[in-house]
Amino acid sequence: MKFIIFCAIVMAVSVSGFIVDVDTEDKWRNAFDHMLMEEFEEKMDQIEHGLLMLSEQYKELEKTKSKELKEQILRELTIAENYLRGALKFMQQEAKRTDLNMFERYNFETAVSTIEILVKDLAELAKKVKAVKSDD
């Protein structure tokens, strides 16, 4: 008997999700924003990991003074910085939207500040790499 009641409750809850009508455009936009922020967080993790790896390569560059390593690090820094500058413009534009609630606005503003910090860190590392005198 308890099992039948439990099944009825589960079925009622699952069906009630289909009965409640939500504006489909708003639902899509929130789903898009959620997916966008998940992708953004994943890419920022990758860039932060890449920045850590480039910092380690910079330490190696200080020891070896290799011209090839210096050029490789500068290329990777340039690519990451350009990617972040494009993402910064997009996130600033999204943060200006008027349909955002307080939580969504906070997410976009946090994304903007995160990107600005990473761009600054990449630029500082690029200055350090350029300052290293290579042997060649």
From Swiss-Prot:
Range of residues in the leader sequence: 1-17
Family named by the database record: Belongs to the mite group 5 allergen family.
Domain of life assignment: Eukaryota
Phenotype when changing residue 48 to A: Decreaced IgE-binding by some of the 24 patients tested
Annotated effect of mutating residue 120 to A: Decreaced IgE-binding by some of the 24 patients tested
Mutagenesis / variant outcome for changing residue 67 to A: Decreaced IgE-binding by some of the 24 patients tested
Effect of residue 76 to A: Decreaced IgE-binding by some of the 24 patients tested
Effect seen on changing residue 99 to A: Decreaced IgE-binding by some of the 24 patients tested
UniProt keywords, alphabetically: Allergen, Coiled coil, Signal
Gene3D superfamilies, per the entry: 1.20.58.970
Effect annotated for changing residue 43 to A: Decreased IgE-binding by more than half of the 24 patients tested. Identified as a major epitope
Protein name: Mite allergen Der f 21.0101
UniProt KW Metal-binding keyword: no
Matches recorded under Pfam families: Blo-t-5
